[in-house]
Design a protein with these regions (language model features):
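Aromatic/hydrophobic pocket-lining residues that form π-stacking "cages" and hydrophobic walls in ligand
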Residues: 15, 70, 102, 153-154
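Helical element adjacent to the flavin cofactor pocket in flavoenzyme catalytic cores
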Residues: 136-156
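Short, glycine/charged-enriched secondary-structure capping and boundary segments
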Residues: 19-21, 41-44, 61, 102-104, ...
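N-terminal Rossmann-like FAD-binding beta1-loop-alpha1 element of flavoenzymes
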Residues: 1-28
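Short beta-to-alpha linker loops that shape the active-site pocket of alpha/beta-hydrolase fold enzymes
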Residues: 32-34, 122, 154
């Protein structure tokens, strides 16, 4: 079997890597001079927690699971991952309701280390944050990586 993957960014190289584990030829086509030079280079580098997507959606089902798998992938590829966490802030009760919705989504999606912080805990976690913020959804499993390094490492 012959497989052709178009795009040598993080996603394309990871797909090609996975396909190469099976019998057959894998061809990776990239239009730029090097891997990871397109969208991957401009990527925010965030490893999303998985709380934003509705549980019934495909992305909702896969985002939290992908987050869990990322540490193993990073070890395999020898690329950095920092679990720095993320926060979504709210000023008032109306915005707080949105945090509660995100919490319910995240729990249904299986997101680890997800909770709502009150004002005091939020300002201890982020001392420089504006005093107008009273609540936050904290996701400790969110992290960052180096997407272009993922693309290069996955291609080796």
């Amino acid at each position: 079997m012959r497989s052709v993957v178009i795009g040598g960014g993080a996603i394309g190289t990871l797909i090609a890597r996975q396909l190469s584990r099976f019998e057959g030829e894998v061809i990776l086509i990239e239009k730029r001079e090097d891997l990871g030079q397109g969208i991957t280079k401009a990527n925010s580098a965030i490893i999303h927690g998985g709380y934003d997507d509705p549980p019934a959606s495909l992305r909702g089902k896969l985002c939290a699971r992908g987050n869990e798998l990322y540490d193993g992938l990073a070890r395999e590829l020898k690329v950095p991952v920092k679990r720095i966490g993320s926060i979504v802030v709210a000023r008032n009760e109306e915005e707080f309701k949105k945090l509660e919705e995100l919490l319910v989504n995240g729990q249904a999606n299986g997101v680890r280390d997800l909770r709502i912080l009150g004002r005091e805990e939020l300002h201890v976690l982020e001392p420089a944050i504006s005093s107008e913020f009273n609540y936050a959804l904290y996701c400790g499993s969110a992290g960052i990586t180096e997407p272009w390094m993922v693309a290069i490492a996955a291609s080796i």
